[in-house]
A protein has these predicted regions:
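A nucleotide- and high-energy phosphate-metabolite-utilizing enzyme signature
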Residues: 1-498
Length: 501
């Protein structure tokens, strides 16, 4: 209580703060003085100011008892300013010591999750919810919760619906972050559920965009939409991070595009699908009060950024057969339908299987996969003798991904069971089942992937770079991945390909 009274009176002594456990004391004094003098606090009602004065002493005590007192204090001060006009939150924190301790622990241990709460104070509802540790987070639960929340909206105003989608996405992603941080979900499970959340969000946004387009231009004749969203990369591989963007490709049924829409301002089919894809990208990336849903990358479509945003599935298939590079077939390994017309998803799966199961020259595949890995590493790897890039480094996540892509391209023609999978753990298991990896190699890759992914997700939650100090265990893990890749004919660490010194 004395510290907060001193802050209110502009009489803080750094030595007193340091003695209380906030070091360096001068930095802590600046944080508290800034909070006490902030415009947000000056604008508080008398009742709100009283609530804050009651809350601050126990809040300071919770910060002092946390794993990182100064960091926790700094973030809590920003949160108090963010919710100063919503004093009900201050009252709830004052009344619930357990929630206060949970908040302080979170703010001390996860810069990323703390920033989410500061940016979207509605997430305090999740922190304050005593059931938070027991709330279901399975894939089906995620989709169902989003569906019910949208169904409860009184009106279908696009902006209001988007705000609700954003709130639910933020809440569910936050809960997933808590589950990973608390050990209730391991890294692969957290990544799968983050991907499931993204799928549900893309599906909701697609429905929103389709209703908006139909209101303006009508619908195309026929069952279903004839439009599909394909997830590539981490989304397609069900390995999404807490701050990942979405790699999306859009396809449509070319036969449906021959007709025009039935509205007052009809569009021909191709332009209708083009508008639909544009609206999906817009709604996913537009900045709202709660931020944007996701960053979106559509450059994996045929002809990349020079190509049309949306193509017919027939044109997509022709491109993959006749003009795609090997690296584009590698990308297809992790591609799958995530939203839109189920019949088109099935047709896409048939196209994907046809392309990936083509017989290939083994030496050419190995050379091209290794060459592309070398190019990516030269452009993107930030490793050196002391630091490892968890994604791009030698023996790190991308080496595992490229190895599995190469193995699938080599073996899918004779082992079509490989084509059922896009996620790394499932691909590792499938490669072992068909003999592309032996049991020991598969176990080592599975363990390495889980370890590296956990480290990468932890870096995100800590708001740290995914370029981390090397240690003996990490170097041994990466060396094992490199040795397995080399044994399979993919020498990703040969001279000129390794990490920079």
């Amino acid at each position: 209580a004395a510290l907060w009274r001193a802050a209110r009176a502009d009489a803080l002594e750094p030595a007193a703060l340091e003695a209380a456990g906030f070091a360096p004391g001068a930095e802590a004094a600046a944080v508290l003085a800034g909070l006490a003098a902030s415009a947000a606090l000056r604008a508080m009602s008398a009742q709100g100011a009283q609530r804050l004065d009651r809350l601050m002493p126990p809040l300071l005590a919770a910060a002092r008892a946390s794993a990182a007192p100064l960091a926790c204090l700094t973030r809590l001060a920003r949160l108090v300013q963010a919710v100063a006009r919503r004093s009900a939150y201050l009252a709830l924190l004052d009344e619930r010591p357990a929630a206060r301790q949970r908040l302080a622990a979170l703010f001390a241990e996860s810069a990323f999750l703390a920033e989410r709460v500061i940016a979207q104070p509605l997430l305090l509802d999740d922190v304050l919810d005593p059931r938070i540790d027991r709330l279901p987070l399975r894939r089906a639960d995620i989709a169902e919760e989003l569906k019910h929340a949208l169904a409860a909206l009184d009106e279908r105003d696009p902006e209001d619906e988007l705000e609700r989608i954003n709130e639910l996405k933020a809440s569910l992603a936050f809960r997933l972050g808590l589950a990973f941080r608390d050990g209730r979900a391991d890294a692969p499970a957290a990544a799968r559920r983050l991907a499931a959340l993204a799928e549900a969000v893309v599906g909701a946004v697609l429905a929103l965009a389709e209703r908006e387009l139909a209101a303006q231009h009508g619908r195309l004749p026929g069952e279903g939409s004839g439009f599909a969203v394909l997830g590539y990369g981490s989304l397609g591989g069900a390995e999404l991070g807490f701050a990942s963007d979405l790699d999306l490709v859009f396809v449509y049924d070319g036969a449906r595009a021959a007709a025009a829409s039935d509205g007052r301002r009809p569009l021909d089919g191709m332009h209708w699908y083009q508008r639909l894809a544009q609206r999906v990208v817009h709604w996913l990336t537009v900045l709202t009060r709660g931020g944007r849903l996701y960053e979106v990358d559509t450059r994996l479509r045929p002809d990349g950024s020079k190509g049309l945003l949306v193509t017919s599935l027939d044109a997509f298939a022709a491109y993959q057969r006749e003009r795609a590079w090997t690296w584009e077939h590698q990308a297809l390994v992790r591609a799958r339908g995530i939203a839109g017309d189920a019949a088109l998803h099935t047709a896409f799966e048939a196209t994907r299987a046809e392309i990936l199961a083509r017989p290939r020259d083994a030496a050419a595949v190995r050379a091209e996969v290794v060459a592309m890995r070398a190019r990516w590493r030269a452009e993107r790897d930030r490793s050196d003798a002391a630091l490892l890039d968890l994604k791009q480094g030698v023996g790190a996540l991308l080496d595992i991904e490229f190895l599995l892509q190469g193995l699938l391209l080599l073996h899918a023609a004779t082992s079509p069971a490989l084509l059922r999978h896009t996620a790394t753990p499932a691909l590792v298991a499938a490669c072992a089942e068909v003999g592309a990896l032996d049991a020991a190699q598969a176990a080592a890759l599975d363990a390495a992937h889980a370890d590296l992914l956990a480290r990468a997700l932890t870096c995100t939650l800590d708001a740290r770079s995914r370029v981390v100090p090397r240690d003996a265990a990490l170097d041994a893990l990466c060396a094992r991945v490199t040795a397995i890749a080399r044994a399979c004919g993919f020498d990703f660490a040969k001279e000129g390909v390794g990490s920079r010194e």
